[in-house]
Amino acid sequence: MKTLLLTLVVVTIVCLDLGYTMQCKTCSFYTCPNSETCPDGKNICVKRSWTAVRGDGPKREIRRECAATCPPSKLGLTVFCCTTDNCNH
């Protein structure tokens, strides 16, 4: 009986997805070679892009991050959300 119970516990642990965390690109650069593990509760990868006007003219800005929810798009702001590892490249 103890062997059966132990077997069931082991099978349950193996079959469960214990502690999976999302991997997302997290940077403020145009290219982003590295990824980071998202904190608990943030299982969406986000890529935001917009054009910033500075003294040297317009420049495309991009920010990649982990998020709990997909933020809304706004005028002049493009938002891309996804739910697989490093999908916000």
UniProtKB/Swiss-Prot annotation:
The keyword Coiled coil does not apply. Belongs to the three-finger toxin family. Ancestral subfamily. Orphan group V sub-subfamily. Expressed by the venom gland. CDD domains: TFP_snake_toxin (cd00206). Residues 1-21 form the signal peptide. This is Gamma-bungarotoxin. The lineage of its organism: Eukaryota, Metazoa, Chordata, Craniata, Vertebrata. It comes from Bungarus multicinctus (Many-banded krait). Exhibits M2 muscarinic acetylcholine receptor (CHRM2)-blocking activity, but has a weak binding activity toward nicotinic AChR. Moreover, it inhibits collagen-induced platelet aggregation. A motif (Cell attachment site) lies at residues 54-56. It is found in: Secreted. Its main location: secreted. GO terms for molecular function: toxin activity. Keywords: Cell adhesion impairing toxin, Disulfide bond, G-protein coupled acetylcholine receptor impairing toxin, G-protein coupled receptor impairing toxin, Hemostasis impairing toxin, Neurotoxin, Platelet aggregation inhibiting toxin, Secreted, Signal, Toxin. One of its GO terms (cellular component) is extracellular region. Disulfide bonds join C24-C45, C27-C32, C38-C66, C70-C81, C82-C87.
